[in-house]
């Protein structure tokens, strides 16, 4: 990704609210207040002008629009008897967007959409951990080992578990992992329940897997208060890393694979041929979030920039894997992970 361009844009976004406050806003509007109608109006307006997925979530031609919801919720706000009740009502309103990046942060709670609704059962963390034993190592937030569990020692399959992108994964970490798995003829990267974090982690891991320097996606940023106010698509380019892994690979995903982890799936699926994805459709989260403060001091986070894959398709709704596979009762009874076992079988078949 062009980090210089992205950082410059972020600096501009940070400075713009300060300029607007200094030049246009009435100081009275900045006063702290717990008034429910005032805070509801602020929340609704912030999302109305800044949220980037109304066309997908609540289109103007749909049965219910964002303006319709304002009319529906205004009398309900007037009936709120407590701060907790008002908080829950605002979260209910936001959940109409079905976006895990739209969250409300109060001193007493955090609310938002549950990205796992309607998901397949794809992960038993306790069983997954068995496949890392007894030779597990850790490089940053990557847990890895050659698989020996369940009589797979001779198969020579490497296994990486990345439960989160919240901590930085450096090229030093990746070099350590791939050097120690260099003898493996195939690799499984487990991204199940990785809820995202630092987009730079997706960039670095993808740069190891892509075959060459390439465009892995596109981004479009909100440029005005209208629902259609967007700038042109900007390319997301990645350079192939000094470390490279081009052997057969299976990446495991589920509905918990979200945000930056979802971006990794988009980057790699659209640009590689040696990588298969297995599990369930990813959770999505194809919008870069930003935050705004409400008059009562609560913080509202929401998606403000839209991301697309290399084929210019939106990744907000999630990405379908090549192979649908869920954890089975039979596999659980045998203390086996059905996805890992199937991935091993595919990798062995592909190496024959």
Model-assigned labels for residue ranges:
Residues 200-334:
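Conserved acidic, small-residue-rich alpha-beta core segments centered on
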Residues 23-220, 227-233, 248, 274, ...:
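Flexible, low-complexity junctional segments that flank or bridge functional domains
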Residues 1-30:
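Bacterial Sec-dependent N-terminal signal peptides
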Residues 21, 185, 321-323:
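Short acidic (Asp/Glu) and glycine-rich catalytic loops that position anionic groups and cofactors
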Residues 324-351:
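Extracytoplasmic/peripheral linker and loop segments enriched in polar/acidic and small residues
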Residues 17, 181-183, 243:
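Alpha-helix termination/capping residues and helix-transition junctions
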Residues 8, 12, 139-142, 287:
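Short beta-strand-initiation
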């Amino acid at each position: 990704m062009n980090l210089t361009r992205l950082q410059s844009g972020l600096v501009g976004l940070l400075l713009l609210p300060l300029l607007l406050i200094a030049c246009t806003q009435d100081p009275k509007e900045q006063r702290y207040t717990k008034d429910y109608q005032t805070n509801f109006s602020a929340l609704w307006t912030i999302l109305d002008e800044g949220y980037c997925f109304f066309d997908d979530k609540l289109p103007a031609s749909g049965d219910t629009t964002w303006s319709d919801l304002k009319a529906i919720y205004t009398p309900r706000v007037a009936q709120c008897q407590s701060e907790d009740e008002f908080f829950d009502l605002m979260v209910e309103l936001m959940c109409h967007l079905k976006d895990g990046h739209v969250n409300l942060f109060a001193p007493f709670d955090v609310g938002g959409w549950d990205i796992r609704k309607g998901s397949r059962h794809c992960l038993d963390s306790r069983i997954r951990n068995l496949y890392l034993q007894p030779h597990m190592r850790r490089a940053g937030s990557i847990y890895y080992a050659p698989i020996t569990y369940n009589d797979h020692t001779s198969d020579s399959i490497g296994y990486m578990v990345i439960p989160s992108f919240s901590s930085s994964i450096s090229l030093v970490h990746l070099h350590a992992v791939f050097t120690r798995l260099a003898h493996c003829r195939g690799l499984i990267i487990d991204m199940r329940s990785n809820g995202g974090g630092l987009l730079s982690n997706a960039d670095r891991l993808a740069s190891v897997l892509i075959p060459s320097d390439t465009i892995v996606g596109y981004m479009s940023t909100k440029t005005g208060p209208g629902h259609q106010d967007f700038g042109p698509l900007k390319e997301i380019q990645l350079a192939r890393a000094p470390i490279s892994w081009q052997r057969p690979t299976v990446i495991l995903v589920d509905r918990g694979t979200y945000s930056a982890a979802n971006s990794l799936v988009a980057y790699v699926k659209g640009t590689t041929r040696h990588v298969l994805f297995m599990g369930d459709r990813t959770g999505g989260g194809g919008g870069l979030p930003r935050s705004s403060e409400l008059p009562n001091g609560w913080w509202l986070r929401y998606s403000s920039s839209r991301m697309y894959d290399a084929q210019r398709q939106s990744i907000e709704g999630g990405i379908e894997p090549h192979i649908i596979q869920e954890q089975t009762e039979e596999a659980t009874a045998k203390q086996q992970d059905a996805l890992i076992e199937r991935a091993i079988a595919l990798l062995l078949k592909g190496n024959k």
